[in-house]
């Protein structure tokens, strides 16, 4: 069921025949683009002859261009009107059969306005924040309190696609695999047990303390004989975090700022587990089947946690809701963030170590 405005071509949904061309619009961030991939794979299975294009941010494209047979059209999100003019020149007089508008921001909607399509499908009115509904002429079925990935799969349902299995399947370049094998060598015929720590989120108030990461790293090394690798980007906050962790745990291997996104993905695929807050690498690990111990207090893992590892997440969001907002998650708007100083201190070293012990106790 979808709600359609009175625009003639929007009546094409759900589709009775495959479209010739589909454009997906999701500019950022890394984690959200990871959530788009199962939607794209579902559409590809249903419509093998359809041409797919993806309008995406430049940083995110460095990872997603691993997907074959997709045209990537990059947009410089910082370029403003100049970026929109460049996109208009790139697209020329092209007109897609269908645009999937997957981003709730006025900046993304400005991009959607530049893209010509017979039908522009967006979120239902209740979820279409920042006036997204003004830039679409069809809506997905209204749902409440969904994980972000599930909300994206609602676009496949609106198009009449029934096979919505979760498949990512990003081919990894052999040089990236080889680099990962160098960092995580073989041990008795399989990759050595390794915990990767991606310690920083895009928002500093979602980050755990360096000394707590170091304590868990020491536990992994001393109790389980694991290798510990610190991973992340080259930003100053990530470098400072890595240096602080290594002061308390010198055995941790510092890879922060040294990997491309495909190399990081290959490293995560070879790892035993990832420890991370609400950050893009948590969803990258999910794409390659690596379990994630997610640290969630500022955000709700039911909405934005690693999709296949929510049982391994430390969910301190209810504690945060009580401590900072005198409320419960059920009473708060679904997209609420509790990015307050000290919120991540609600997560203890002991509960993270216990979760790691439980995960490692499972048969390989």
What is each model feature region?
Residues 1-364:
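Catalytic machinery of carbohydrate-active enzymes
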């Amino acid at each position: 069921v979808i709600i359609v405005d009175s625009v003639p071509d929007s009546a094409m949904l759900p589709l009775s025949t495959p479209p010739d061309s589909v454009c997906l619009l999701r500019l950022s961030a890394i984690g959200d683009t990871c959530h788009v991939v199962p939607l794209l794979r579902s559409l590809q299975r249903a419509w093998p002859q359809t041409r797919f294009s993806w309008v995406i941010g430049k940083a995110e494209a460095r990872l997603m261009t691993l997907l074959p047979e997709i045209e990537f059209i990059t947009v410089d999100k910082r370029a403003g009107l100049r970026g929109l003019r460049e996109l208009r020149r790139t697209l020329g007089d092209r007109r897609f059969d269908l645009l999937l508008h997957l981003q709730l921001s006025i900046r993304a909607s400005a991009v959607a306005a530049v893209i010509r399509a017979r039908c522009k499908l967006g979120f239902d009115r209740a979820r279409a924040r920042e006036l997204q509904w003004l830039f679409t002429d069809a809506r997905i079925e209204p749902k409440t309190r969904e994980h972000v990935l599930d909300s994206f799969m609602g676009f496949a349902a609106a198009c009449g696609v029934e096979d919505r299995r979760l498949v990512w399947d990003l081919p990894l370049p052999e040089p990236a695999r080889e680099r990962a094998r160098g960092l995580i060598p073989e041990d008795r015929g399989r990759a050595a047990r390794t915990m990767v720590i991606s310690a920083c989120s895009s928002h500093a108030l979602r980050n755990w303390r360096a000394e707590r990461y170091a304590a868990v790293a020491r536990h992994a090394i001393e109790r389980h004989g694991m290798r510990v690798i610190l991973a992340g980007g080259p930003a100053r906050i990530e470098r400072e975090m890595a240096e602080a962790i290594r002061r308390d745990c010198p055995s941790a291997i510092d890879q922060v700022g040294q990997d491309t996104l495909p190399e990081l993905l290959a490293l995560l695929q070879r790892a035993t587990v990832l420890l991370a807050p609400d950050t893009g690498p948590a969803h990258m690990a999910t794409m390659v089947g690596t379990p994630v111990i997610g640290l969630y207090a500022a955000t709700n893992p039911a909405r934005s946690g690693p999709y296949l590892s929510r049982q391994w997440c430390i969910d301190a969001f209810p504690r945060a809701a009580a401590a900072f907002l005198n409320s419960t998650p059920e009473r708060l708007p679904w997209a609420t963030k509790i990015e307050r100083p000290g919120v991540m201190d609600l997560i203890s070293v002991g509960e993270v170590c216990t979760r790691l012990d439980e995960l490692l106790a499972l048969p390989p």
